[in-house]
Curated annotation (Swiss-Prot):
The lineage of its organism: Eukaryota, Metazoa, Spiralia, Lophotrochozoa, Platyhelminthes. The active site is at E188, K230. It catalyses: beta-D-fructose 1,6-bisphosphate = D-glyceraldehyde 3-phosphate + dihydroxyacetone phosphate. Pathway: Carbohydrate degradation; glycolysis; D-glyceraldehyde 3-phosphate and glycerone phosphate from D-glucose: step 4/4. Belongs to the class I fructose-bisphosphate aldolase family. This is Fructose-bisphosphate aldolase. Its EC number is 4.1.2.13. PROSITE patterns: ALDOLASE_CLASS_I. InterPro entries: Aldolase_I_AS (IPR029768), Aldolase_TIM (IPR013785), FBA_I (IPR000741). Pfam families: Glycolytic. The record marks Y363 as: Necessary for preference for fructose 1,6-bisphosphate over fructose 1-phosphate.
Amino acid sequence: MSRFQPYLTEAQENDLRRIAQAICAPGKGILAADESTATMGKRLQQIGVENNEENRRLYRQLLFSADHKLAENISGVILFEETLHQKSDDGKTLPTLLAERNIIPGIKVDKGVVPLAGTDNETTTQGLDDLASRCAEYWRLGCRFAKWRCVLKISSHTPSYLAMLENANVLARYASICQQNGLVPIVEPEVLPDGDHDLLTAQRVTEQVLAFVYKALADHHVYLEGTLLKPNMVTAGQACKKAYTPQENALATVRALQRTVPPAVPGITFLSGGQSELDATKNLNEINKIPGPKPWALTFSFGRALQASVLATWKGKKENVHAAQEELLKLAKANGAAAVGKFEGNMGTTLGDKSLFVANHAY
């Protein structure tokens, strides 16, 4: 009997690797449209639109029915479960709109954060119990990748050893289950930007968290070539009194990744973490311009930083749909350029430099 029992066939590994590589193709990234019903409610409230299923459907239809040019810079979209079953005005399922544009549908599979007992307001993420059966069903409905978010906070005594260990193991269990069911797992250990910590502290904590994550992924025999990482960019805390340049943020980010992320991982798809549309894009651009070894694609998996101007333009009005879609195309093109280090510094969107920070952000 072999000491190591493979849990994936060669064909399964090939499929996972192919999907992961397609998602992080040069100049392409992910639109994170997986906001929960409650979070969508907050976004719709900001533009004076009622949070009901029809308005959520109309908004997501707006996103997914944009011009086919969207696929030049968006390779995948993360969906919320409700969206899987919603249909466009002409009767097509919303994931079908994506497939018609050669955009890969993905799905958020975690069930939110819950308190981690024995810690100071730290959390773990729930949703493992029925994950295998849900993943099998999501694959049947056309999804080819998944996302699971864990959250860690920086303070004088957090993240704790327990929180880092627990969240890393949860992410590894999730990743293993996804792969067994044909879904590429996006591993998201978000270190929140809340706090007054400086850039070096953010870098060191990010390194610590990622080290825990990749140890757990190895322990659980996760096939790294069939995964993607969705980390925070390394930035100082929102309340830090010192301002750092995009170049300083980029250098700290790349150093943290070089020290912790194996080269077998095909791509790193950064979250925007409440940065303004312009700041997130500038930071991504500078990350790609940093010299030195970067063996992974460095691209985006943005939610707010790809949608804020879209929502502000739409305002829930049918006559604004085309203009809102044009905002989405501008944002996608700008971030596609940033993903190869060629963003020119201006995207011309409605809310380009407006901060999108939400304290203690929950999806």
